[in-house]
């Protein structure tokens, strides 16, 4: 199995790295990285992206440009984690194979830093370009966005792996629920939602968002969730993997405003969830109401419409309160930032509180204290 994986990666590398140099137009093209302190080049990138109708994404950790022989920037592309983002070529040079060269460079960069399973979000009108470069469609929002990966059967293999958990299912189970949870950190509000879903259903599939962009690391979030729900015996735990991502890291460069970004994320995320639900026979999903969150409010509204269209019930559960205030992870983070660890004691399960007063918890506390107020609040 390992040799097959190496072979497929090697072939993808050959296809994307060797082919570009067969274009004679490439002789005078240079691909170079651009750093955040290069103000002039970054301003030129913004200009190019604007010309091509693309916003610069807020989440980028690497950017490159294509220079012509006169050192003009005629193309650009970026990465974030295991994704490729913000690809654009000047309209004057489109059709010359520059996209191929930029993508090849980005894939080489990703391989060099150990990322072999790659993803890209692209416009509906240009996804065929990436199909020709070895990327495969996962899901799409018609006339808007296509989500792609460089593994031919990557998502199908993920679904097959998930479906193995059905072997542990009660054969007579009729009510099979799901919750997708970040838990940054795990609170009594999260526990209330899980306990309700567990009580009202035969089986509960609990997906823990595994991308490590939250201030509380994934391994800690997973541990606290599992410890805090150990008394519930009908839960099947899943790492979300690379297919379910948070709104915080969803690419924003396709949409004109924040509302459009949230709607795109919700629609794409729910397309993926529906496929997961079918693989696991899930027929109901539980989510927590979050009246103060613009993101969750829009997401829940779309979900309440889309899931029933696919035969899945959607329950939006009123949030648990303490002294008239909603218990939320952002409120817990706020108290930690203020140094009020004792103040979270009645807002989190015992296992979460014990973590934050432990030596291991001190590192996370220090990171939370360094956050600005915008990063504390969940929008």
How would you label these PLM feature ranges?
Residues 65, 71-88:
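Conserved beta-strand in the GNAT
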Residues 66-70, 201-204:
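A generic structural motif
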Residues 21-57, 67-68, 72:
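Short amphipathic alpha-helix that is part of the acyltransferase structural core
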Residues 122, 126-135, 140-379:
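Nucleotidyltransferase catalytic core that binds NTPs
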Residues 110-123:
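Conserved GNAT acetyl-CoA-binding A-motif
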Residues 60-62:
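Short loop/turn microsegments at loop-to-beta-strand junctions
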Residues 2-24:
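Classical Sec-dependent N-terminal signal peptides that target proteins to the secretory pathway
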Residues 93, 97-105, 189:
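Conserved acetyl-CoA pyrophosphate-binding loop and the N-cap/start of the following alpha-helix
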């Amino acid at each position: 199995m390992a040799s097959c994986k190496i072979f497929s990666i090697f072939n993808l590398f050959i296809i994307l790295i060797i082919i570009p140099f067969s274009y004679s137009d490439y002789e005078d093209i240079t691909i170079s990285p651009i750093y955040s302190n290069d103000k002039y080049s970054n301003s030129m990138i913004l200009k190019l992206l604007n010309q091509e109708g693309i916003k610069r994404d807020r989440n980028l950790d690497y950017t490159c440009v294509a220079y012509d022989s006169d050192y003009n920037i005629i193309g650009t592309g970026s990465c974030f984690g295991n994704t490729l983002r913000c690809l654009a070529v000047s309209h004057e040079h489109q059709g010359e194979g520059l996209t191929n060269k930029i993508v090849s460079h980005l894939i080489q960069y990703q391989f060099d830093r150990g990322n072999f399973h790659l993803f890209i979000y692209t416009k509906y009108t240009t996804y065929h370009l990436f199909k020709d470069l070895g990327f495969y469609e996962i899901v799409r929002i018609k006339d808007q966005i296509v989500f792609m990966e460089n593994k031919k059967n990557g998502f199908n293999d993920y679904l097959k792996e998930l479906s193995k958990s059905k072997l542990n299912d009660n054969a007579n189970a009729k009510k099979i629920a799901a919750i997708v949870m970040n838990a940054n950190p795990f609170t009594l509000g999260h526990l209330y939602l899980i306990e309700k879903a567990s009580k009202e259903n035969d089986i509960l599939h609990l997906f823990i968002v595994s991308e490590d962009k939250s201030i509380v690391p994934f391994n800690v979030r997973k541990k606290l969730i599992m410890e805090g729900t150990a008394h519930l015996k009908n839960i099947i735990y899943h790492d979300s993997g690379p297919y379910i991502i948070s709104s915080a890291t969803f690419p924003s460069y396709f949409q004109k405003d924040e509302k459009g970004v949230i709607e795109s994320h919700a629609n794409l995320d729910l397309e993926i969830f529906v496929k997961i639900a079918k693989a696991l026979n899930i027929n109901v999903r539980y989510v927590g109401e979050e009246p103060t969150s613009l993101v969750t409010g829009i997401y829940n509204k779309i979900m309440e419409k889309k899931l029933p269209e696919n035969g899945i019930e959607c329950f939006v559960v009123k949030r648990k309160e303490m002294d008239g205030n909603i218990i939320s992870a952002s409120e817990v983070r706020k108290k930690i930032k203020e140094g009020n660890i004792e103040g979270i004691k009645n807002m989190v399960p015992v296992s979460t509180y014990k973590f934050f007063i432990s030596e291991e918890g001190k590192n996370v506390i220090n990171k939370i204290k360094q956050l600005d107020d915008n990063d504390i609040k969940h929008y």
